[in-house]
């Protein structure tokens, strides 16, 4: 298998992956210190995209996926194989799945439509088990959402701004798989093991590829392989 698999098609970021913890390295021989709240606040300011695409923008860095980027991505297709990023529906309640997927079938016998079948599906998208995409209205910073939108746009009926409907046309771009366990020569990363910028850079070097603007990064941690071997993922403070 090639070191990098370019996944083409409708690509969604999969937040069910293990938390990607990115921290700057200290100057002391590859020693990483836990960042303080003050440091994180500084990073937020340094990488902020607020206002970059106008005060009314609701798409964030999806703006980097231009028509030209999509055309360039389409030209990379060779095998034409579709690869799903969705995880199977988990129906068992466990420590890493507090809200199991529920599916039920209903059979109705109506005149002229005997044995008609319908189904009902219930899924709580947020959590640590179900594949989902977090909208930009998911998190606030000091009472504000992305681009300075007020928290008032969020109500019990949904988000008037920054909702997931901004992705209604899908995400089509170049996908880059970064297989961190393979890089480190292990089957999976254990809970609490962080991924640092130098890990991503090492994968770029090993795979002879360079991440560019508008790319989607698919970072493999091996969480599901570990779960299959050792059971439910421990939802501790540093292993979400």
Give the positions of each predicted feature.
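Bacterial N-terminal signal peptides that target proteins for export
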Residues: 2-14
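Accessible peptide chain termini
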Residues: 1-2, 47
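Active-/binding-site microenvironments in catalytic and ligand-binding cores
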Residues: 26-240
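Bacterial N-terminal signal peptides
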Residues: 11-23
């Amino acid at each position: 298998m090639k070191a990098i698999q370019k996944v083409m098609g409708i690509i969604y970021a999969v937040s069910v992956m293990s938390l990607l913890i990115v921290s700057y390295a200290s100057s002391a021989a590859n020693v990483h210190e836990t960042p303080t709240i003050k440091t994180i606040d500084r990073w937020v300011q340094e990488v902020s995209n607020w206002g970059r695409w106008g005060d009314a923008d609701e798409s964030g860095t999806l703006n980097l996926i231009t028509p030209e980027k999509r055309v360039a991505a389409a030209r990379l297709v060779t095998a034409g194989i579709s690869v799903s990023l969705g995880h199977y529906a988990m129906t068992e309640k466990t420590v890493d799945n507090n809200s199991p997927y529920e599916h039920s079938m209903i059979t109705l016998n109506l005149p002229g439509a005997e044995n008609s079948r319908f189904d009902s599906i219930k899924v709580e998208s947020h959590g640590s088990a179900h594949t989902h995409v977090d909208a930009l209205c998911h998190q606030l910073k000091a009472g504000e959402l992305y681009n300075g939108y007020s928290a008032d746009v969020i109500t019990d009926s949904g988000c008037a701004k920054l909702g997931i409907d901004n992705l209604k046309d899908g995400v089509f771009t170049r996908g880059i798989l970064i297989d961190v366990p393979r890089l480190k020569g292990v089957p999976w990363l254990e809970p609490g093991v962080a991924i640092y910028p130098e890990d991503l850079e090492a994968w770029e070097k090993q795979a002879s590829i360079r991440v560019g603007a508008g790319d989607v990064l698919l970072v493999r941690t091996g969480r599901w392989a570990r779960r299959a071997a050792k059971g439910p993922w421990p939802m501790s403070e540093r292993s979400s």
